[in-house]
Amino acid sequence: MTNSSNNYVILVDENDNPQGTMEKIEAHEKAKLHRAFSVFIYNSKNELMLQQRALSKYHTPGLWTNTCCSHQKIGESNIEAGKRRLQEEMGFTTDLQETISFIYKAPFENGLTEHEYDYILVGEYNDDPKPNPEEVNDWKWMKLEDIETDIKKNPSLYTEWFKIIFEKHKNEMVKSPI
């Protein structure tokens, strides 16, 4: 697989059947449904690790969101993709498990649209991450009830997909402490 494959997403139908590939920016410009994943890392206190997206990101720079998210590569499992991206963005890896999947659509002010068949992956980690500054501006641990309160008070500080996932699926996302 060439380096350019990093810039492609897997187009899917509403049942997650592959329909080909498309360059990532083009898929977001055309609001094409594509496969994605969102990683949620909890510590032993059941706090969620949030990241603030790097200010250089092409969409939603500087907004708070889940631990990491991205797109699977062709032939890559959801878990493999989640572990790869967790290492690339946050500088660590841990065991992950799939919880739920769903489709969402979120348009942005810059004309791009996230339209994703999103897999939610959860894991546990109790150390500080070593974030990649090209991907992550900041990070923090937060209790779910504090996230819920802050999203209501300051919705513009969070990514649209995180607000959608959190509101609709927060009860299914929680990983019981080990």
Q: For the regions a protein language model found, what residue spans apply to each?
A:
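Acidic, metal-coordinating catalytic segment for phosphate/diphosphate chemistry
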Residues: 2-38, 44
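Intrinsically disordered, low-complexity, charged terminal extensions of DNA damage-control enzymes
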Residues: 8, 58, 175-177
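A residue-level structural signature of the nucleotidyltransferase/glycosyltransferase Rossmann-like core
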Residues: 9, 47-48, 139-140
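Nudix hydrolase/Nudix homology domain
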Residues: 23-25, 62, 103-105, 112-178
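Conserved Nudix-box catalytic region and its N-terminal flanking loop in Nudix hydrolases
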Residues: 25-37, 43, 47-84
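Active-site segment of metal-dependent pyrophosphate-handling enzymes
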Residues: 31, 45, 77, 87-128
